[in-house]
């Protein structure tokens, strides 16, 4: 039944529709740090809710594909999507100064870790040696969190591989969601630009070990194993 009582004022509705960061900056400019802090905290959770919804949606969709069409369709699905989205990004990344990508990848993982909020929050460290930067996620903000949150458990859990594939890092019972990394990070970039864009190693034990990505200062130093696991050789 309709009501004549308003739930919010026009100003309140206007504020709800503004970017939270803009409101936080405005609060700082107005000398209101408490409101700015509150808005910054709210913004972390705004992104996490959307992030987790999309991650679980992707996990559910690829699980459905494997269940209904078979595991060979998993490869076809990832390839189809990446050709239409990720390929152009890989080519752009390869064109940028490699030092700049370290900062961009760190920003990506800050976002993907959803600012460390929510249950089993994402977290990562970065280290540097003479040849590369190592990003260690423990847990990563999506695939590993799904496992630690129990999203693969029970009758309605997400799917895992029934067989070992090169795109499941030679492992059976491997989380289907995480197989996208084989295609996005290694297999398809090798086909597009000649080398893996983000050579990576998934956790051995998802409950304990990190997921590790590498960014080499010179792509020529990327170890051959990141080709060989797919039956390929560096060129």
Tell where the protein language model's regions lie, with residue ranges.
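N-terminal accessory segment detector
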Residues: 1-210, 217-235
């Amino acid at each position: 039944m309709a009501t004549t009582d308003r739930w919010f004022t026009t100003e309140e509705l206007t504020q709800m529709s503004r970017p939270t960061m803009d409101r936080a900056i405005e609060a700082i400019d107005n000398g209101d740090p408490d409101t700015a802090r509150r808005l910054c905290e709210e913004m972390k959770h705004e992104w996490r809710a959307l992030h987790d919804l999309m991650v679980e949606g992707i996990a559910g969709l690829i699980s459905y594909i494997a269940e209904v069409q078979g595991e060979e369709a998993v490869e076809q699905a990832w390839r189809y999507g990446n050709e239409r989205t990720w390929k152009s990004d890989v080519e752009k990344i390869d064109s940028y100064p490699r030092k700049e990508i370290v900062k961009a990848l760190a920003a990506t993982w800050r976002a993907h870790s959803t600012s460390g909020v929510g249950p089993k929050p994402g977290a990562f460290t970065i280290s540097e040696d003479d040849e590369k930067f190592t990003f260690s996620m423990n847990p990563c903000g999506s695939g590993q969190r799904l496992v630690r949150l129990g999203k693969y458990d029970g009758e309605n859990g997400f799917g895992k591989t029934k067989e070992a594939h090169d795109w499941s890092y030679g492992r059976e019972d491997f989380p289907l969601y995480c197989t996208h990394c084989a295609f996005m990070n290694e297999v398809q970039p090798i086909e597009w630009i000649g080398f893996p864009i983000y050579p990576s190693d998934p956790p051995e034990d998802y409950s304990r070990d990190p997921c590790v990505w590498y960014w080499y200062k010179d792509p020529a130093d990327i170890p051959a194993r990141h080709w060989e696991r797919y039956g390929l050789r560096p060129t």
